Every structure is written in C-alpha cells, then in structure tokens.
Amino acid sequence: MKEFVIVTDTTTDLPREYVEKHHLYMMSLPYTLEGTSYTWENPMPVKEFYDKMRAGSLPTTSQANPEEAATLYESILKENDVDILHIAFSSGLSGSFNSCRIAAADVCEKYPDRRIVVVDSLAATLGQGLLVYKAVQLKEAGKNLDEIAAWLEENKYHLVHNFCLLYTSDAADDMQCV
C-alpha cells in the first residue's frame, strides 16, 4: 500500500495546530479586504476581519488556478514518494475543484507512478473540515487512499450546513440574523 498525504484548502477553518499535528498540506485560497490580500500564511486577525465587515467592507475571494495547484502537488511529489488525496472546497462555491482536477491530470503525466485523487467536498468551512477530520481518522486507522476517497464520496451528501445571514436595514444600524 503506497503512502499518501492529505491536501485540503484553507477554507476548512481547521486550527493551524491540527493541520500541523496531522501533517496536512493546505491549498491557500486568498481573500482581499480593503485592497489588501490575505492568505493562510498571512491572515487578518479574526476580530479585525469582522469589525471591518460590520463597518461595511466586503471581502472578495479568489479560486486556486491550475498553476498554483500544480505547484503545490509537484512540491509534495518531489519531496516524498507518496500519492495525494485532495479534499477540495465545494465546486458549487468556487472553481478551485476544477482547477485542481486539471492540475492533477497535468502533474500525473510528469509523475506517472503517482496518483492524485481530488474529491469535491460539496462543502465549505467546518463542513469541509469535518470531512478532512474523518479522512485523517480513517488514515490513522490504516485505511488506504481508495477506501477513504470512497468514504468521502458516499458521506459528503450527509453533511448539513447552517448559515446565519447578517444584514443591516435602513431602519436599524445593528446587525440582524434572518
């Protein structure tokens, strides 16, 4: 059984300590607020982020492009004799999943003895993080890449996401949950 590593996106909201402890690789999906770009490596403090949003600033996000994904995959494969399982941000919310599939196909042409399996989590934030968490548990229990990918494909449909949408009305300056 060939060793493999788990890659996911910074959209999982997993704690940095967890990522480091379990040797996860992160695909950075940057965001921009008030003209400044932020990444996993260079984040804006959470309180500052929400304070700016309360004041009316809106962040924009950027998907991973195939070149960025290929660079990450190649850096992993050059350093390690492993396969890759990438649990990607929802294809319904970003083009990153498709960029990663394109990159995986290109990189596998250069490394024909390696596999890169990209799973569309159909999830975001901690929903995606829960899938990563379970993949880590399964890997630590001795499951192989194919078994974990199959589990993810079957179980990603059982996640429920709840969101609280905040808005300001003309009649009130305070935020309200709808």
For each feature predicted by the language model, list its residue ranges:
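The start of beta-strands in P-loop NTPase/AAA+ ATPase cores
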Residues: F4, D81-D83, R115
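Cationic, low-complexity basic patches in intrinsically disordered or flexible, solvent-exposed regions
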Residues: C177
